[in-house]
From Swiss-Prot:
GO cellular component terms given for this protein: apicolateral plasma membrane; bicellular tight junction; membrane; plasma membrane
Stretches assigned to the Cytoplasmic side: 1-7, 103-116, 185-219
Protein name as catalogued: Claudin-6
Topological region Extracellular: 29-81, 138-163
UniProt superkingdom: Eukaryota
Pfam families, per database record: PMP22_Claudin
InterPro entries tied to this protein: Claudin, Claudin6, Claudin_CS, PMP22/EMP/MP20/Claudin
Gene Ontology molecular function: identical protein binding; structural molecule activity; virus receptor activity
Species: Mus musculus
Length: 219
């Protein structure tokens, strides 16, 4: 019963992490304008994402433009785009593996095989959490490094956008969800041999010793 609860909690956290990763990948808010120095009086804000950049006016109007070329992106955003797409696909693969091994499905009948599939899905989710963390931390490091670089003009400096925080949340949820699935598999797997030994001990007939047979007097 406890392993079933861990599986449900783990898969729910994983789904939330996947949704956060998808939103983080889609939103053009990886880098936002830093209002410092002369840029304080600027009446517009620049958002930079993985797929497009947007300019938000002080009046609320927003204009977005898709990047013309992948090579025009900075190195950190190029890597982030590739890793985010790979992560989303890996999570979908992990979900398919989990569905094959879930207790509520009949794709696989053997209980040990189901436990192995759940364990594999948990490992896949942990790997996807690490892959989500890499581009987010890389982009954050690049933003902070440029922010404190005196050679970079104030108008070109950026701050951490909302997509980075969503990416960190997605990574944490995927790591936690995958870890719970691995724990559920280990806790559920330890009950199988004990149950088998109990059934085996009750099914084996008890052998009698010579002294236990009733003695009869023969005339």
């Amino acid at each position: 019963m406890a392993s079933t609860g861990l599986q449900i909690l783990g898969i729910v956290l994983t789904l939330l992490g996947w949704v956060n990763a998808l939103v983080s990948c889609a939103l053009p808010m990886w880098k936002v304008t830093a209002f410092i120095g002369n840029s304080i009086v600027v009446a517009q804000m620049v958002w930079e994402g993985l797929w497009m950049s947007c300019v938000v006016q002080s009046t609320g109007q927003m204009q977005c433009k898709v990047y013309d070329s992948l090579l025009a992106l900075p190195q950190d955003l190029q890597a982030a785009r590739a890793l985010c797409v790979v992560t989303l696909l890996i999570v979908l693969l992990g979900l398919l593996v989990y569905l094959a091994g879930a207790k509520c499905t009949t794709c696989v009948e053997d209980r040990n095989s189901k436990s192995r599939l759940v364990l594999i899905s948990g490992i896949i989710f942990v790997i996807s959490g690490v892959l989500t963390l890499i581009p987010v931390c890389w982009t954050a490091h690049s933003i902070i490094q440029d922010f404190y670089n005196p050679l970079v003009a104030d108008a070109q400096k950026r701050e951490l956008g909302a997509s980075l925080y969503l990416g960190w949340a997605a990574s944490g949820l995927l790591l936690l969800g995958g870890g719970l699935l691995c724990c559920a598999c280990s806790s559920g797997g330890t009950q199988g041999p004990r149950h088998y030994m109990a059934c085996y001990s009750t099914s084996v007939p008890h052998s009698r010793g010579p002294s236990e047979y009733p003695t009869k007097n023969y005339v």
